[in-house]
């Protein structure tokens, strides 16, 4: 199941790369969409929770 996490101020390649690098270290299947300022997570609610925590820990605000 696809889940969309909206990330406030995800408006630069460097920010997207920070998220990609951090999530790559997890088992989360994800895609960062810079144009729509979101992270698309494929998986169950546990995978979404992991992704949300990683994104929050990086200092990003989830909408």
Identify the residue ranges that each predicted region occupies.
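Extended, compositionally biased intrinsically disordered regions at domain boundaries
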Residues: 1-2, 52, 63
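A generic structural motif
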Residues: 37-42
């Amino acid at each position: 199941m696809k889940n969309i996490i909206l990330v406030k101020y995800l408006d630069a390649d460097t920010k997207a790369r920070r998220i990609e690098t951090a999530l790559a270290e997890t088992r989360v299947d994800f895609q960062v969409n810079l144009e729509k300022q979101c992270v698309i997570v494929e998986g169950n609610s546990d995978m979404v929770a992991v992704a949300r925590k990683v994104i929050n820990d990086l200092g990003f605000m989830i909408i």
